[in-house]
Amino acid sequence: MANFSEPPPGGFGSLDMPWMIIPDWFEWKRVHNQGVAFGLGNGTSWAPIVFLVVPIIALFIIRYFWKKGAFEHVYSKLAVSLLLCGIFGNLTDRLAQGFLLEYAKNDSFWERLSQGYVVDFISVRLPFYDKIVPSSHGWWPTFNVADSCICIAAVLLFLGGLKEEQAKKMKNSD
């Protein structure tokens, strides 16, 4: 049994102890990720700080546009809700993993901040992905629920923007 109160011996990569839910298709797999969705920026020295600051800035930007009435369509409102869930989920995880773990209690503020990471755990195998990234053996990069919320929000924001544009064109043609 793994002791998840200590950092993994190899750093913040995969703990490589999958729990197969649907064989060869879906598994739970604990992965420590200092980067963002799908491991982008993971293992870099700048990622923990940048990916702590960027979501905070994003929250202020979302608030600004919300007050300006930028999210009129139901798709856009749902997207903002999902985006906030994703931001707060990953932000909470990153702060908790950097500051609340027992092994970091004697570290300085900046050392703790630089140790922050999110826990990704959803791993799925896609039939075509090994053709794109042969080294993946078909396994999509491990992600978490917050990453899913952010990705779905991006699609909904795009669709909401299209719907709002269509509504404006119809209103102007009347």
Q: Where do the protein language model's features map onto the residues?
A:
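Alpha-helical transmembrane bundles and membrane-interface segments of multipass inner-membrane proteins
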Residues: 1-174
